[in-house]
Structure formats: C-alpha cells, structure tokens
C-alpha cells in the first residue's frame, strides 16, 4: 500500500512544465506563427484472445494520433502562403500533380522550455505532413486575429528528453 509522506511533498524540488512555454519548428513555417499545438499521443489496437468462457487482451499495432496546430495568419510573412507552399509539395491544385512523399514529409520538432528558456523536453515528429488545413473564418463584427487550423499526421514520434 502506498503511503503519503508530507516531507516528500513539502521538501522535494518540483517545477512543473507550463503549457505556454514551447516552440515548434517546422521547415517553412516561422515558429512565431504557432499559437497552439497538441503534444503527440499514441493509441494501440486491441487484440482479443477468446478461450472458452473468458477473454484475454493484448496490445496490437500502435498508431500515432494526428495533432492539431493553430497558426496566426499575419500580413507579412503570410501564414497562408507558408501553409500553401507545404501543401503544394504534396498536391498542386492547378495542375492536379501530386508529389512524392519524400518531397512533402518533414520532421517537426516541439521544444518545451523551462522558466529561464532552457529546453526541458523535446519531441521530434518524423514524416510529418499536412492532413487537413482550414484557413479560418472571417467576421465583420470581430477584431480577432485571423488564424489557420492544421491537422498534422506523422509516422512516429521520438521523445529525445
């Protein structure tokens, strides 16, 4: 049974990571355009082993889940232009030409920062591409900044530290 020792809680150095201290690097997308992003997540298939009157379960294949990223869309440099340049590597709307995966898949890096700006956690998403892009809505009644929502799909993620 676990026991709770107050001295462990009160006198153990503890500095939580905070959600607002991160930098995301994706080739062709300026890091300061990124407003929000999800950290990687993985989900495993379930394999059922039936035997007489019971079921046993084991883990099946793992699938890394897509992440959602929100970008600001400034006048210069245009966030929409940066996103479309990445999309054009996989599909050119005018000609209908698709690109090889080697052209449009990129490595994306997430760094979580400590209080003094040091990197305390680093994720590298391998083989990342844009699965969906939503260039946002417009509204005469709002002064909110324009935003772009991206869904990024990737092959796998590596937690460096």
Predicted regions: what is each one?
Residues 1-161:
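Glycine-rich, low-complexity intrinsically disordered segments
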